[in-house]
Amino acid sequence: MEKVKAKKHLGQHFLNDQQIAQDIVDGLTLHGSYKEVLEIGPGMGVLTQYLLKNNSYHTKVVDIDGESIEYLKKVFPQLKDDVIHGDFLKADLADWYPDKFAIIGNFPYNISTEILFKVLDYREQIPEVVGMFQKEVAERFAAKNGNKTYGITSVLLQAFYDIEYLFTVPEHVFTPPPKVKSGVIRLKRNNRTHLPCDEKEFFKVVKAGFNMRRKTLRNALKSINVQNISMDLPIFDKRAEQLSVQEFFDLTNMLSGK
């Protein structure tokens, strides 16, 4: 059967290493007791084949590429109606899943961050994600405070998920090979059903802090209307990258007068 042509505008790089594909699928731990798994951007099904061998969950795949969809239907007839031709970013995931489900994929680099922000929107339904990203992006998501790659996305994602960097993937195991290495990470939903601070204010404080990441919080937070707070407190001598997620919660409450 003729292979699917990788399309540059879709950010497609097809993984062709079977052991790495198996290792990615093995990254799923069933954290959160889900019974459904959604694979985003399956391409030619290198991950799909291993997902279908696992009887612990039921697999669906979604791809925006019509050529890939037709290929998958022929190669994996057992998927039947579980091959979805659509745009994950535009879909209402509750239409596909009334209950919990995990997400896995070799994510297109050009939309990988958007995928995880959509995951945040459905965080009560998605207890686990295993995904491949550009290495520097994967490292940023998993970074802890004090690391130069720690940033806005690190904090916002880690407010709701525990993130673990699993392994690095070299360029040559893809067709076509990307120009950078890739990294696989796993996100596991933590126990926070609600943040211990106002969510909108938290997002605002995090973004303001990192938008001027080289400056101390005393200067970086000037864009926020801070009232009745002494800016002489030691925390304002720090830069955003030095604060843990919990310290951002505390800072948000402090600035909100709570």
UniProtKB/Swiss-Prot annotation:
Catalytic activity: adenosine(1518)/adenosine(1519) in 16S rRNA + 4 S-adenosyl-L-methionine = N(6)-dimethyladenosine(1518)/N(6)-dimethyladenosine(1519) in 16S rRNA + 4 S-adenosyl-L-homocysteine + 4 H(+)
Cited Pfam families: RrnaAD
Binding residues annotated for S-adenosyl-L-methionine, in chain numbering: 13, 15, 41, 63, 87, 106
Compartments reported by the entry: Cytoplasm
Enzyme class: transferase
EC number of the protein: 2.1.1.182
A molecular-function term among this protein's GO annotations: RNA binding
Keyword annotations: Cytoplasm, Methyltransferase, RNA-binding, rRNA processing, S-adenosyl-L-methionine, Transferase
Assigned GO CC terms: cytosol
Keyword Transferase attached: yes
Main location: cytoplasm
SMART domains xref list: rADc
Primary role: Specifically dimethylates two adjacent adenosines (A1518 and A1519) in the loop of a conserved hairpin near the 3'-end of 16S rRNA in the 30S particle. May play a critical role in biogenesis of 30S subunits.
Protein name: Ribosomal RNA small subunit methyltransferase A
Species whose genome carries this gene: Cytophaga hutchinsonii (strain ATCC 33406 / DSM 1761 / CIP 103989 / NBRC 15051 / NCIMB 9469 / D465)
